[in-house]
């Protein structure tokens, strides 16, 4: 595994990352990390690599777009001095075109999304894992 002993792994993104994390910083164990994939990854790392003492932090904010991340990157990422950053963003960049079509300035067009991701990459000193929006196909057996 590439994550070394005692390293800090910071997750940042939108509601997919946030998932009801503690404020102002989601860290520690269990509920403080939220109820989603960050908590699951922390539990996995603790179970499989307990000797590594990996410090997991959740800085996700529901409703955020890549534009919001650019604005809060310094305070929520750089100031935390992580060794690794896991970024999951883009759902709301697209969704704002549909949930508030009468307010087009809330949407983040693809060219701005790319520009924002490049800006975040340039501002990041830590090793980075990028997650972009993914498509979930509905389960045909769901009611």
What are these regions (language model features)?
Residues 2-32:
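Short glycine-rich His-centered loop
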Residues 11-12, 58, 130:
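A structural signal for the hydrophobic beta-strands that form the central parallel beta-sheet
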């Amino acid at each position: 595994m590439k994550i070394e002993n005692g390293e800090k792994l910071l997750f940042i993104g939108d509601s997919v990352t946030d998932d009801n994390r503690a404020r102002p910083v989601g860290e520690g164990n269990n509920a403080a990390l939220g109820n989603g994939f960050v908590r699951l990854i922390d539990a996995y790392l603790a179970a499989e690599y307990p000797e590594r003492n990996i410090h997991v932090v959740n800085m996700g904010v529901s409703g955020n777009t890549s534009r919001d991340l650019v604005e809060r990157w310094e305070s929520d990422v750089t100031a935390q001095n992580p060794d690794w950053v896991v970024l999951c963003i883009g759902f709301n960049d697209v969704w704002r075109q549909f949930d508030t079509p009468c307010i087009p300035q809330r949407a983040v067009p693809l060219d701005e999304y790319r520009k924002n991701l490049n800006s975040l990459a340039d501002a990041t000193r830590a090793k980075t894992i990028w997650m972009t929006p993914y498509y979930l196909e509905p389960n045909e057996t769901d009611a």
